[in-house]
Amino acid sequence: ARDYSCLRIVQWGFKAILKVTGVHTTVIGFENIPDEPVLFIGNHRSFFDILLTYSRCPRLTGYVAKKEMEKIPLLSTWMRFVYCLFLDRENPKEGLKTILQAIDYVKQGISICIFPEGTRNKGEELSMLPFKEGAFKIAAKTGCAIVPISMNNTAAIFENQFPRIKKVNVVVEYGTPIYPKDLAPEDKKHIGAYVQNIIQETINKNAELI
């Protein structure tokens, strides 16, 4: 109960920020999220991606953040409280520990969200950086569903005109759950590329909604 209270408090705060900033969000496919722990995989162009997605998590969800976030007092403590994990991108051994902890969380019934580009993509609006395959071990080892999250126009909120915040329309689409066991052997072997193709097709499709 305490965990869910924390989740709802953070969600309330994120929703309040989005309301104040005047961001209008078109949400598609929210009903695709199964009532079970999942691995959310999203493209990443803005700090606001976290607010847009976390504010809609139906169950406890730990986000995988970059290691540098762990150095921020209070924030890092609160993040740990809501099952967030810190990934050291420069240290493969420590990175593996983080993935193993994420696997353990899923087994406990907690969803995980990760942006496998590894950093914010500052390229063209419909571009993506290559997905890092390590994140997908979470689904491969637990058998949980992967739910793709495709986001359009989120960099226009803040990053495109830093430090100003702009009222814009964004699109967030939750894709059909992907269960690794149901994939063809070749797709299972390159699951990162498989999921990235789905997100790429979706952001291309939704560009006309902006």
Where do the PLM segments sit?
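Catalytic core of membrane glycerolipid acyltransferases/transacylases, capturing the structured
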Residues: 1-12, 18-21, 35-92
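A generic structural signal for well-ordered alpha-helical segments
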Residues: 17-18, 79, 105, 139
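Short gly/ser/thr-rich secondary-structure transition/capping motifs
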Residues: 19-28, 95-96, 154-156
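Generic preference for hydrophobic
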Residues: 27, 40, 63, 114, ...
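A short, glycine/Asx- and small/polar-enriched loop/turn
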Residues: 34-36, 166-167
